[in-house]
Structures are given as C-alpha cells and as structure tokens.
From Swiss-Prot:
Residue positions binding Mn(2+): D49, D167, E169
Pathway: Protein modification; protein glycosylation
Organism the protein comes from: Canis lupus familiaris
Site (Important for catalytic activity): R160
Position of sequence motif DK motif: 592-599
Name this polypeptide is given: Dolichyl-diphosphooligosaccharide--protein glycosyltransferase subunit STT3A
Principal location class: endoplasmic reticulum
Glycosylation-annotated residues: N537, N544, N548
Length: 705
C-alpha cells in the first residue's frame, strides 16, 4: 500500500491500523527487553525452581504424558522419593511440551531447553495484548494502549518473566489477566458463552500456579460487593454461577488440586457466595409474588434459619476435619508474623519476606504515583467492571506489602490503573490544546478563556511525556542490571570495568555428574536440590519443594552439629557427599554461612532437634560472629568447618590477614583444624562451591579411613 493509499483510508481504518501497530510494537518490546540474560551470557535456565520445571518438562517431552503423570522420582528426597504427577501444577510443562511438539511437527527443530528459556518472554507478549483488551473494557482504547506499553517493561513483572526464568508465574500472569478479561465480559453481557470462556481460562490458571486461590476469592468478593451495593442483577447471577460451577469441576481435574475446591477453607468463600446468589435469586422471586408485609416476615424467618444452619454445618465440618484449615502460607498473608513464629521453613524463603517501601519504587516507579489517579477515575465513574478493578488494586496492594513475591500480582493492576490515569490526564489537557495559528484566532476567542490555558496544557503534556520516558529508562536499567543475571552464573565488575564471570555452580555440578557414582547421595541445604538433580543427575536428600519439614530439619541438625553428631545423622541418611556454598573468598553474600541461622531454627523446630538452640550460636552480647569472638558452638559445627576448611591459609585482600572473610568482613576465629569425618573432594575455582566426601567406617567400625 502506497503512502497516498494509506491516506485515502477512512479515519476508522487508519485508527485501527495505528492501534494495531502500537500494540504490536508493545508486544515486540515486551519480548525483546527480556533477552538481556541470553545476550549477555547464553541460553540458560535461571534460579532454582526453574531447574525442576525444566527437568520435568524434558521428561514429559521425551516420555509422554502417561509416564509423566505416573512418574515416581527416586532422585529426590532420599530415601522417601517423590510422586511428581500428583504434586505439581502441570500447566507450564504441558504448554512447553505442546509448543515443542508443534514446532517439530512443522520440522522446526529446537531443543526443549530453548523452548523453556523463551517461554516466559513469549507469554509476556501475550500479556500485553490481554492487558490492552482488559483496560479497553474499563475505559477506552487509548488507556489500553498505555497500559499495554507499561506492562511490557514494568520491572515488577519482568522480574519473573525474563528469558530463562522458567517458572509458573511466567504464564500464570497471562492466565490471570485473561480470566479477569473474560469475567468482565461475562459481567457486562450476562452471557453463558463468555462465562464458559472465563471458566476455561480459570482452568488454565489453576493448572499453572497455586496463586489461583487469589483469583477464586477475588471474583466472589466482587459479586458480594455488587450485592451489598444493590448492583446485583440477572447478568451477575448467570456469570458467577456458570463460572463457579464449570470452574470448580474443571479445577478438580488437576491431580494436585483434587477435591480442595470443595473441602478446603481457601475455597469456602466462593462456595458461600454461590449460595448467596441462590438465596438472592429466590428472594427476588418471592418479592415478585408476595405483598411487602408477607415478604418481610418470610424474609426475616428464612434468613435467620438459613444463617443458623450454615453456621452450624460449617462449624461441624471444621471440627470434624471435613473442611481443611487454612495452609501456613495463607495464614502468613493474613498475619505476617505467623510464619516467623510458627513455621520457620516458610519464613526462611526470601520471597516470603515483607516488602520494603523502596521496592515499590524500584519495581513500579511512575506507576506508584499514577495508580491513585486511575483509582480516582474509577471511583468517579463507577460501573460493575470498575468496581472489580478497584477491588483487585486494593487487595493486591495489601498482599504485596505482606509478601514481596506478590509484587508480581500487583504489577498488572498498577499498569492498568496507571494507564487509565495517564490517559485521563492526557485527554483532559489535550482538549485544552489549541493548535491553530495565533494570527487566525479572533480577539473574542482569545478572551473567552483564561490567557495561559494553551501553555498549561502544553506544559502538562510535556511533563507526562517526560515521566513516561524516565519510566522507560528506569525499567530498562532495572531489567538489565537487577533482573537479567542468572543465579547459576554470577558476574561482577573488575577494576578496569570489565565483566568477570563466576561459573562455579555449573563447574561443581559437572564435577559431581562425572566423578561420583550414579547412586551417590548428596546432602546440601534445600535451596540447591533442584539444581543438583537437574544438572548433576544425582540423588539428593531435600530440595525446594519443602514438603517434609522433618526431613529438612534433619539436614539442618547435621549442619548445626559437631562432626561426631553430624556423622551419625549422615550415616543414618546414607549420605555420600556434602555440598556447601561459600562466598568468603569472592564476596558472594548469599552463601550458607549467611543462611546458617535458618538451618539452626529449622533444625531445632522438631522433636529430634530440640537440643539445638539458636542462642547457643550467638556471642554473649547477642551477635552472630565468625571471628575469635564467635560462639564456640558455631566455630566447631560442621557447616563452619566445611566452609572454612583450609581458608585460614588463604589471602583474600591486600593488607588483610589470611582467612579474612570478605562477606562478614572479619578474620575467621577457627583456622587450624582438620576434618575427622569428611575429606575434601572438590573445590571450585573461586571457592564458591565446596564438596566433601563422607568417610567410611572400617570393617570393625572402630575408626574412619
């Protein structure tokens, strides 16, 4: 089409083409901005959980769904093992395997690893499109395009969707927004068609991420608010009843979910609102058949009876255990101190910590300030759909403050409401912008408005443009510097500004894979379990699934005990090798010494570890120190000795004594010691990973060789 031909198109067609072009550019930007890690390093899986997801996806692609669904993994949680098919959300793996097989059907040969690496950026592009349609339903196409452009680069979402971040959240945010879009369409139309599509989107969400619980509580809450505000109608009744019935039946097809939608407390709100819908419909029917006096007497009687019966039945079901109580993670959302005081394994995960104020600006920047503007617009122009987005924004704001991981749930609604806010500000001032030539304006036109209306409008538009540009630069910088570094490969800047690569993790796992027996059992802290099984292909005792607190506690007890007591535990668990992460030489702060207090807390949280007390590992003044002032219990435990073995002879910095720990900024207190029950098997180039072999007893069990 020539340029002249384009200009001859009708205004509507030009408008459509321009929207399509902008939306396509946002989708391409969303994909490309997540590729920093691939360009800087290589096509590699990030973090810890993604390695398990990659391993299971590879098994599914090679062996098929039947074997995948019935897979018993004997490489994990030795000697217990783990049933894979019934303990995971399979949506991520099935999606990747389906894409892999479709590409191979068309003779596009691509490794399953590369499918996994690029899946999250691909779905982030789909998310921009869904965000556009969702925001368009709330305001207009202009707001939708702004929201799509914002979510394409928002760091709060990019943090879990960069190339290589192969985790459930990579596709779950798309599923969540798709479900919300279908729900709003169902609410607006009252159509079973849209409600059924919403149920299907919800089913995809359930199959992909445990965060579906937020969704199945938010939608009923929306319906309840519509009831309380007098907005409940036949449209809402049809939409919710269809979504709840179909969605519940479909969600129960996921093995890991099973009967939870009708048995667990997290799902009871949805069931209760479903019952309220039936009562509301019945009351409306009675109102149409009875006079006001009869209706009031009957209404009070029925409500009292139904309320009493429901409370009695609910209490009995809770007491008899037919309805399971809330899980620890759910309790920790309602009471942030619950996990810290009762379940240290949950509190030990960095993702479960409360969010700091600085994190909001770091992950959202401009959106923090434009979110209230969009919220104000929705309050000023209330509708059923806008009530939903208000509730989504307010609830996700609270939950993101309780748990930093849920910043991911907040980011999309921040983009939507900020897109609405920016669109409203720009459209308001654009109306005041007069682009006609000054010499052609009549004196009457000039005097009819305040003198500087045009200048104020121009200034505000320039200010908003500046804010949007700074938002883009900030998001790109955060993506590049903070969220595009795979934890499996570390990097740092040298004195001359060049990039230094630390590839110790893969070096260690490669050594394990090729230099240890295939049936070797490796003991490490649970953080590294998935990586060891995926990359070293060796049996591990605990991993990131953390389903058995007692087993993890036993590992923590071994790490926190003296060599003799630890040896008894290691022999009990048939351990062949022990792996620890140590950052004292390179300055890597996420090492096992810094995680050690969590090992102590978790180790002492069970009956077999009651003798382990956290205060024993502190100095008399309450400090955790690794130097000569440190606690003797700490300086003689297994973890300390494995990390600092031979370290007392190493010079780490100029003008510092040997054995100077660059993370703790201290000279270690216990330098001259030998290991009795372990022998050093391998230490990586930068001492980041240290592997020890457990010595065997001699034939009579009198000494170790």
């Amino acid at each position: 089409m020539t340029k002249l031909g384009f200009l001859r198109l009708s205004y509507e067609k030009q408008d459509t083409l321009l929207k399509l072009l902008i939306l396509s550019m946002a989708a391409v930007l969303s994909f490309s901005t997540r590729l920093f890690a691939v360009l800087r390093f290589e096509s590699v899986i990030h973090e810890f959980d993604p390695y398990f997801n990659y391993r299971t996806t590879r098994f599914l692609a090679e062996e098929g769904f039947y074997k995948f669904h019935n897979w018993f993994d004997d490489r994990a949680w030795y000697p217990l093992g783990r049933i894979i098919g019934g303990t995971i959300y399979p949506g991520l793996m099935i999606t990747s395997a389906a894409i892999y097989h479709v590409l191979h059907f068309f003779h596009i040969t691509i490794d399953i690893r590369n499918v996994c690496v690029f899946l999250a950026p691909l779905f982030s592009s789909f998310t921009t499109i869904v965000t556009y349609h969702l925001t368009k339903e709330l305001k207009d196409a202009g707001a939708g395009l702004l929201a799509a452009a914002m979510i394409a680069v928002v760091p709060g979402y990019i943090s879990r969707s960069v190339a290589g971040s192969y985790d459930n959240e990579g596709i779950a945010i798309f599923c969540m927004l798709l479900t919300y879009y279908m729900w709003i369409k169902a609410v607006k139309t009252g159509s079973i068609y849209w409600a059924a599509k919403c149920a299907l989107a919800y089913f995809y969400m359930v199959s992909s991420w445990g965060g579906y619980v937020f969704l199945i509580n938010l939608i009923p809450l929306h319906v309840l608010v519509l009831m309380l505000t007098g907005r409940f109608s036949h449209r809402i009744y049809v939409a919710y009843c269809t979504v709840y019935c179909l969605g519940t039946i479909l969600s129960m097809q996921i093995s890991f979910v099973g009967f939870q939608p009708v048995l667990s407390s997290e799902h009871m709100a949805a069931f209760g609102v479903f019952g309220l819908c039936q009562i509301h419909a019945f009351v409306d029917y009675l109102r149409s058949k009875l006079n006001p006096q009869q209706f009031e007497v009957l209404f009070r009687s029925v409500i009292s009876l139904v309320g009493f019966v429901l409370l009695t039945v609910g209490a009995l079901l809770m007491l008899t255990g037919k309805i399971s109580p809330w899980t620890g993670r759910f309790y920790s959302l309602l009471d942030p101190s619950y996990a810290k005081n009762n379940i240290p394994i949950i509190a030990s995960v960095s993702e479960h910590q409360p969010t700091t104020w600085s994190s909001y600006y770091f992950d959202l920047q401009l959106l923090v300030f434009m979110f209230p503007v969009g919220l104000y617009y929705c309050f000023s122009n209330l509708s059923d759909a806008r009530i939903f987005i208000i509730m989504y924004g307010v609830t996700s704001m609270y939950f993101s403050a309780v748990m930093v991981r849920l910043m991911l749930v907040l980011a999309p609604v921040m983009c939507i409401l900020s897109g609405i806010g920016v669109s409203q500000v720009l459209s308001t001032y654009m109306k005041n912008l007069d682009i006609s030539r000054p010499d052609k304006k009549s004196k009457k036109q000039q005097d009819s408005t305040y003198p500087i209306k045009n200048e104020v409008a121009s200034g505000m538009i320039l200010v908003m443009a500046f804010f949007l540009i700074t938002y883009t630069f900030h998001s790109t910088w955060v993506t590049s510097e903070a969220y595009s570094s795979p934890s499996i490969v570390l990097s740092a800047r040298g004195g001359d500004g060049s990039r230094i690569i630390f590839d110790d993790f893969r070096e260690a796992y490669y050594w394990l894979r090729h230099n240890t027996p295939e049936d070797a059992k490796v003991m490490s802290w649970w953080d590294y379990g998935y990586q060891i099984t995926a990359m070293a292909n060796r049996t591990i005792l605990v991993d990131n699934n953390t389903w058995n607190n007692t087993h993890i506690s036993r590992v923590g007890q071994a790490m926190a005990s003296t060599e003799e007591k630890a040896y008894e535990i290691m022999r009990e668990l048939d351990v062949s090798y022990v792996l620890v992460i140590f950052g004292g030489l390179t300055g890597y702060s996420s090492d096992d010494i810094n995680k050690f207090l969590w090992m102590v807390r978790i180790g002492g949280s069970t009956d077999t570890g009651k003798h382990i007390k956290e205060h024993d590992y502190y100095t008399p003044t309450g400090e955790f120190r690794v130097d000569r002032e440190g606690s003797p219990v700490l300086l003689n435990c297994l973890m300390y000795k494995m990390c600092y073995y031979r370290f007392g002879q190493v010079y780490t910095e100029a003008k510092r004594p040997p054995g100077f720990d660059r993370v703790r900024n201290a000279e270690i207190g216990n330098k001259d010691f030998e290991l009795d029950v372990l022998e050093e098997a391998y230490t990586t180039e930068h001492w980041l990973v240290r592997i020890y072999k457990v010595k065997d007893l001699d034939n009579r069990g009198l000494s170790r060789t």
